[in-house]
Swiss-Prot record:
Superkingdom in the source lineage: Bacteria
Main location: membrane
SUPFAM superfamilies, per the entry: Type III secretion system domain (SSF140591)
Organism for this UniProt entry: Yersinia pseudotuberculosis serotype I (strain IP32953)
UniProt-recorded name of the protein: Outer membrane protein YopN
GO CC annotation, single: cell outer membrane
Keywords: Calcium, Cell outer membrane, Membrane, Plasmid, Virulence
Function: Plays a major role in regulation of the low-calcium response. Seems to sense the calcium concentration and to transmit a signal to shut off yop transcription when the calcium concentration is high.
The keyword Membrane belongs to this UniProt entry's keyword annotation: yes
Gene Ontology process terms (BP): negative regulation of protein secretion; protein secretion by the type III secretion system
Amino acid sequence: MTTLHNLSYGNTPLHNERPEIASSQIVNQTLGQFRGESVQIVSGTLQSIADMAEEVTFVFSERKELSLDKRKLSDSQARVSDVEEQVNQYLSKVPELEQKQNVSELLSLLSNSPNISLSQLKAYLEGKSEEPSEQFKMLCGLRDALKGRPELAHLSHLVEQALVSMAEEQGETIVLGARITPEAYRESQSGVNPLQPLRDTYRDAVMGYQGIYAIWSDLQKRFPNGDIDSVILFLQKALSADLQSQQSGSGREKLGIVINDLQKLKEFGSVSDQVKGFWQFFSEGKTNGVRPF
């Protein structure tokens, strides 16, 4: 029979080992089998094994947490890069808007606010532009301007936080706003229909369409002095292009419903104009003897 303990192999004590110590360490022993032989393990060895197992478990758990954190950071950075690429692709087609984004002025203002918080930074961006895609674009410009500025490391970290937050929470909103900007900008150049309501109406139609009554109500509120017929035509063209780019799926079905409803609104608008004209005809007294009621 083989005996194992934490001081020696076999029953013979090591050189200069005190016998009474060795015997006291083998008082509590565990009997078992190892490769066909009987094995005795002293209690001190069992405790050492347990301690090592606990330590190894802790190390692996710690490494797993670090790995998970790194993976989350990598995913967040990838999301920011994806959104940034699409924003640059679409907004670069409207250089007039990019010229309004004075990053150096923004950097100068923020660098004088060492204790600015994330919510304050977002509020400041919203004050510069109500469009999320433009806010994201400004943040990207700030991030690039802060490279090589170690004295503004706190601001650089804050900007990175804001980019990750916007990409994760408003990614689709940002991309849709950027995607429709070139067409919306051209439509707004007539001076009748403003740019931002055009972007908002398109985005709502894609992300959260609430039905024909809701969109008609939105059109009335957002374009009180605008040309609603031209807005409907603008939406039809934009959504039809989106529809053609989608091969199948629920998104395609939803777009089809919105486009059909817009056509109904267009026809309704035409009838509404006729009714208004008819009513004006009578109100001006051009009845030729015909009574309105």
